A protein has these predicted regions:
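Conserved ABC transporter NBD signature motif
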Residues: 57-68
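Conserved ABC ATPase signature
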Residues: 143-148, 152
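A short, proline-enriched helix->beta-strand linker immediately N-terminal to the Walker B motif
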Residues: 163-167
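Helical segment within the ABC ATPase nucleotide-binding domain
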Residues: 184-197, 209
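A short, surface-exposed alpha-helical micro-motif characterized by mixed small hydrophobic
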Residues: 211-213
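ABC ATPase "signature
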Residues: 229-230
Length: 262
């Protein structure tokens, strides 16, 4: 199992905001963490990545290919991020530096983790921009984040996250800030890239309809605890918890299941 989370806790001061969360992500699996705002899903992801805010402390176990990540030194975690584990945030401005070109930022990830030359990094940046369907990739890599649309910025952030071909992608509500049409395009892009590269995926969302488009299994959280774990098809047709039933009622996007989704 590539990622195994066991009894994960997150404490902020005396308050426990993630309480005993456990789930696994086998190689190549697509697993969704779903819950309302404040359910602990994003903090769970940040704990896995070693990116918790100041004052928050993680406990329990997070094992990546058998290696324990809880308590791992920051330098070693930073090496894993971007190399073995890619990250896409809800708001691409979180990932993109406003005073650096898109190409420099995509290429910088490759230079840091693979040690390539500046010329090779720029070539790779153009390749990755094309891979995420950014228009006119040879020119767009010379632009700054503010010169791109919201959907284009998210594509650029995805290109950065996947430039080094990580084995696991963690995507934290990457489509929430986008309109419905662009949201669908980004979901289809992510699904295609994950399948093409054989990556594992942890996808975080509050929308069961969105989850149904990209994940095969779901972990439902409420108040920091797991209340249900099941295939997404089961969550949609036979939810076992009141929380999941509420998420199903609240789903507003069109439910669509790609061919072959189990």
């Amino acid at each position: 199992m590539s990622l195994e989370v066991t009894d994960l806790t997150v404490d902020i001061g005396e308050r426990r905001v993630v309480d005993g969360v456990s789930f696994g992500v086998p190689d190549g699996a697509r697993v969704g963490l779903i819950g309302e705002s404040g359910s602990g899903k994003s903090l769970t992801a940040l704990a896995i990545l070693g990116l918790l805010p100041d004052g928050a402390e993680a406990g329990g176990s997070v094992r990546w290919n058998g290696r324990e990540l809880i308590g791992l030194p920051d330098r070693e975690l930073a090496t894993l991020r971007g190399d073995e584990i890619g990250i896409v945030f809800q708001e691409p401005r979180t990932a993109l530096n406003p005073i650096r070109t898109i190409g420099r930022q995509i290429g910088e990830s490759v230079r840091i983790h693979e040690g390539v030359s500046r010329g090779e990094a720029r070539r790779r940046a153009v390749t990755e921009a094309a891979r995420v369907a950014l228009p006119d990739p040879g020119r767009i890599v010379a632009r700054y984040p503010h010169q791109l649309s919201g959907g284009q910025r998210q594509r650029a952030a995805i290109a950065m996250a996947l430039a080094c071909r990580p084995r696991l992608l963690i995507a934290d509500e990457p489509t929430t800030a986008l309109d419905v049409t662009i949201q669908s395009e980004i979901l289809e892009l992510l699904l295609s890239l994950v399948e093409d590269d054989g990556m594992s995926l942890v996808f975080i969302t509050h929308d069961l309809a969105v989850l149904s488009q990209i994940a095969t299994h779901g972990v439902v959280l409420d108040e920091g605890r797991v209340v249900e774990t099941a295939p997404v098809s089961t969550l949609l047709t036979a939810p076992a918890s009141d929380v999941t039933r509420g998420l199903l009622r609240d789903a507003t996007a069109t439910l669509w299941r790609p061919e072959g989704l189990a």
